[in-house]
């Protein structure tokens, strides 16, 4: 457990640009399944399946003097609104459920979610994240 590497991409809506953060020693639990495609319109020789992928990303952090720090990551976590309003986004990261995504590998190539998804596997758009600040301090980030 906790032997995966992921790259998180944060989208800056004001500059239309992405900032990336590499996390090592995180846990990724992936689910893949196929869903029958019902768009064949009577052509039963052409029944395709679409893959449905989901991932749970678990990132441990330390809560020191009100700051959330991840081992090996020289950046500070900020809540999404605070991150969007800060000038220096390169020294911080966040989890935005409407536009951020992650890939299960170290990848410093910055492209949009759609571009990266077209030629890489294991790319997930963040749709939920939970912050477990008062228990075993960690984030659970869900993506599809």
Residue ranges and their predicted role:
Residues 21-144:
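Short, conserved turn/kink motifs that form compact alpha/beta structural patches or helix kinks used as
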Residues 1-23:
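N-terminal intrinsically disordered, low-complexity, charge/repeat-rich segments that act as generic
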């Amino acid at each position: 457990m906790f032997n995966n590497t992921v790259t998180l991409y944060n989208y800056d809506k004001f500059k239309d640009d992405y900032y990336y953060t590499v996390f090592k020693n995180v846990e990724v639990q992936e689910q893949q399944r196929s869903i029958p495609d019902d768009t064949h319109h009577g052509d039963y020789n052409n029944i395709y399946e679409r893959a449905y992928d989901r991932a749970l990303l678990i990132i441990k952090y330390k809560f020191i003097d009100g700051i959330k720090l991840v081992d090996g990551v020289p950046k500070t976590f900020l809540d999404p609104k605070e991150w969007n309003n800060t000038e220096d986004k390169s020294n911080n990261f966040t989890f935005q459920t409407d536009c951020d995504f992650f890939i299960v590998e170290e990848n410093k190539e910055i492209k949009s979610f759609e571009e990266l998804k077209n030629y890489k596997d294991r790319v997930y758009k963040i749709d939920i994240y939970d912050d477990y600040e008062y228990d075993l301090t960690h984030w659970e980030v869900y993506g599809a």
